[in-house]
Amino acid sequence: MEANPDDIADAKTSAFVEALKQAASREGFDICRITHPHAIPQAPERLRAFLDNGYHGDMGWMARDPERRAQPAELWSQVRSVIVLGMNYAPAEDPLPDLRARDKGVISVYAQRRDYHEVIKKKLKNLARWMVAQSQVNVGVDVKVFVDTAPVMEKPLAAAAGLGWQGKHTN
Protein backbone atom coordinates (compact mmCIF):
# COMPACT_ATOMS: atom_id res chain seq x y z
CA MET A 1 0.00 0.00 0.00
CA GLU A 2 1.40 3.40 -1.02
CA ALA A 3 1.36 6.31 1.41
CA ASN A 4 -1.00 9.18 0.65
CA PRO A 5 1.07 12.35 0.02
CA ASP A 6 -1.53 14.42 1.91
CA ASP A 7 -1.13 12.18 4.96
CA ILE A 8 2.65 12.59 4.79
CA ALA A 9 2.31 16.39 4.51
CA ASP A 10 -0.15 16.44 7.43
CA ALA A 11 2.23 14.38 9.56
CA LYS A 12 5.16 16.68 8.72
CA THR A 13 3.04 19.74 9.50
CA SER A 14 1.85 18.27 12.80
CA ALA A 15 5.41 17.39 13.79
CA PHE A 16 6.60 20.89 12.89
CA VAL A 17 3.77 22.56 14.82
CA GLU A 18 4.58 20.48 17.90
CA ALA A 19 8.29 21.31 17.58
CA LEU A 20 7.39 24.99 17.11
CA LYS A 21 5.31 24.99 20.29
CA GLN A 22 8.20 23.42 22.20
CA ALA A 23 10.67 25.97 20.80
CA ALA A 24 8.29 28.80 21.73
CA SER A 25 8.03 27.42 25.25
CA ARG A 26 11.83 27.33 25.52
CA GLU A 27 11.85 31.03 24.63
CA GLY A 28 9.43 31.72 27.48
CA PHE A 29 6.15 31.92 25.59
CA ASP A 30 3.24 30.49 27.53
CA ILE A 31 1.03 29.76 24.55
CA CYS A 32 1.48 29.28 20.81
CA ARG A 33 -1.30 28.97 18.26
CA ILE A 34 -1.47 29.21 14.48
CA THR A 35 -4.19 30.63 12.28
CA HIS A 36 -4.74 31.39 8.61
CA PRO A 37 -4.09 34.96 7.44
CA HIS A 38 -7.65 35.19 6.10
CA ALA A 39 -9.20 33.99 9.37
CA ILE A 40 -10.65 37.39 10.25
CA PRO A 41 -12.96 38.29 7.32
CA GLN A 42 -15.09 40.52 9.57
CA ALA A 43 -12.11 42.67 10.55
CA PRO A 44 -12.30 45.29 7.75
CA GLU A 45 -15.96 46.06 8.45
CA ARG A 46 -15.49 46.14 12.23
CA LEU A 47 -12.41 48.34 11.95
CA ARG A 48 -14.20 50.74 9.60
CA ALA A 49 -17.15 51.05 12.03
CA PHE A 50 -14.74 51.55 14.94
CA LEU A 51 -12.95 54.36 13.08
CA ASP A 52 -16.15 55.93 11.69
CA ASN A 53 -17.54 56.16 15.22
CA GLY A 54 -14.37 57.89 16.40
CA TYR A 55 -13.64 55.21 18.98
CA HIS A 56 -9.93 55.53 18.27
CA GLY A 57 -9.91 58.95 19.99
CA ASP A 58 -6.55 60.69 19.66
CA MET A 59 -4.87 57.63 18.17
CA GLY A 60 -4.84 59.01 14.63
CA TRP A 61 -2.36 56.37 13.52
CA MET A 62 -5.16 53.79 13.71
CA ALA A 63 -6.97 55.48 10.81
CA ARG A 64 -3.95 55.25 8.51
CA ASP A 65 -4.11 52.38 6.02
CA PRO A 66 -7.09 50.53 7.56
CA GLU A 67 -7.02 47.98 4.71
CA ARG A 68 -3.46 46.97 5.64
CA ARG A 69 -4.38 46.84 9.31
CA ALA A 70 -7.47 44.67 8.78
CA GLN A 71 -5.95 41.87 6.70
CA PRO A 72 -2.45 40.39 7.13
CA ALA A 73 -2.20 39.63 3.40
CA GLU A 74 -2.56 43.36 2.66
CA LEU A 75 0.45 44.04 4.88
CA TRP A 76 2.54 41.14 3.56
CA SER A 77 1.26 39.45 0.40
CA GLN A 78 3.35 36.28 0.89
CA VAL A 79 1.91 35.47 4.32
CA ARG A 80 0.74 31.85 4.60
CA SER A 81 0.25 31.44 8.35
CA VAL A 82 0.00 33.66 11.40
CA ILE A 83 1.65 32.40 14.57
CA VAL A 84 0.15 34.03 17.65
CA LEU A 85 2.13 33.81 20.87
CA GLY A 86 1.36 34.84 24.42
CA MET A 87 3.69 35.60 27.29
CA ASN A 88 2.83 36.48 30.86
CA TYR A 89 4.79 39.62 31.58
CA ALA A 90 3.30 40.23 35.02
CA PRO A 91 5.51 40.95 38.03
CA ALA A 92 6.25 38.17 40.50
CA GLU A 93 4.50 40.08 43.28
CA ASP A 94 1.05 41.69 43.25
CA PRO A 95 1.53 45.47 42.90
CA LEU A 96 -1.91 46.42 44.26
CA PRO A 97 -0.94 46.55 47.97
CA ASP A 98 1.52 49.35 47.11
CA LEU A 99 -1.43 51.51 46.03
CA ARG A 100 -2.85 51.45 49.55
CA ALA A 101 0.15 53.35 50.92
CA ARG A 102 -1.17 56.84 50.18
CA ASP A 103 1.90 58.55 51.65
CA LYS A 104 4.20 57.57 48.77
CA GLY A 105 4.14 57.55 45.01
CA VAL A 106 3.98 54.37 43.01
CA ILE A 107 5.70 53.74 39.70
CA SER A 108 3.62 51.82 37.20
CA VAL A 109 4.65 48.17 36.89
CA TYR A 110 5.44 48.38 33.18
CA ALA A 111 7.85 51.29 33.83
CA GLN A 112 9.79 49.29 36.43
CA ARG A 113 10.93 46.68 33.95
CA ARG A 114 12.56 46.51 30.55
CA ASP A 115 10.31 47.55 27.70
CA TYR A 116 8.27 44.48 26.78
CA HIS A 117 8.63 45.34 23.08
CA GLU A 118 12.38 44.76 23.35
CA VAL A 119 12.14 41.69 25.59
CA ILE A 120 9.53 39.92 23.48
CA LYS A 121 10.95 40.96 20.11
CA LYS A 122 14.31 39.40 21.00
CA LYS A 123 12.55 36.14 21.86
CA LEU A 124 10.51 36.30 18.65
CA LYS A 125 13.66 36.78 16.60
CA ASN A 126 15.24 33.76 18.30
CA LEU A 127 12.15 31.72 17.45
CA ALA A 128 12.22 33.02 13.87
CA ARG A 129 15.87 31.94 13.52
CA TRP A 130 14.90 28.50 14.83
CA MET A 131 12.10 28.28 12.23
CA VAL A 132 14.41 29.28 9.39
CA ALA A 133 16.99 26.71 10.52
CA GLN A 134 14.32 24.00 10.61
CA SER A 135 13.08 24.92 7.15
CA GLN A 136 16.49 24.48 5.53
CA VAL A 137 15.80 20.75 5.54
CA ASN A 138 12.57 21.11 3.57
CA VAL A 139 11.54 24.43 2.09
CA GLY A 140 12.59 28.02 2.63
CA VAL A 141 10.81 30.17 5.18
CA ASP A 142 10.52 33.92 5.56
CA VAL A 143 9.40 35.20 8.94
CA LYS A 144 8.18 38.63 10.05
CA VAL A 145 7.95 39.41 13.76
CA PHE A 146 5.69 42.02 15.34
CA VAL A 147 5.19 43.11 18.94
CA ASP A 148 2.16 45.39 18.59
CA THR A 149 4.28 47.79 16.56
CA ALA A 150 2.91 47.02 13.09
CA PRO A 151 -0.57 47.62 11.69
CA VAL A 152 -1.75 44.12 12.58
CA MET A 153 -5.06 43.40 14.32
CA GLU A 154 -3.64 41.20 17.07
CA LYS A 155 -6.86 40.74 19.03
CA PRO A 156 -9.01 39.27 16.20
CA LEU A 157 -6.09 37.13 15.02
CA ALA A 158 -5.55 35.83 18.54
CA ALA A 159 -9.25 35.01 18.85
CA ALA A 160 -9.19 33.25 15.45
CA ALA A 161 -6.19 31.23 16.63
CA GLY A 162 -8.11 30.10 19.70
CA LEU A 163 -6.54 32.44 22.26
CA GLY A 164 -9.64 33.71 24.02
CA TRP A 165 -12.28 35.93 22.53
CA GLN A 166 -12.88 39.56 21.68
CA GLY A 167 -15.79 41.52 23.07
CA LYS A 168 -18.47 43.12 20.93
CA HIS A 169 -17.43 46.68 21.75
CA THR A 170 -13.65 46.39 21.66
CA ASN A 171 -11.25 47.35 18.90
Language-model features: where?
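Auxiliary alpha/beta "docking" domains used to position bulky ligands
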Residues: 1-171
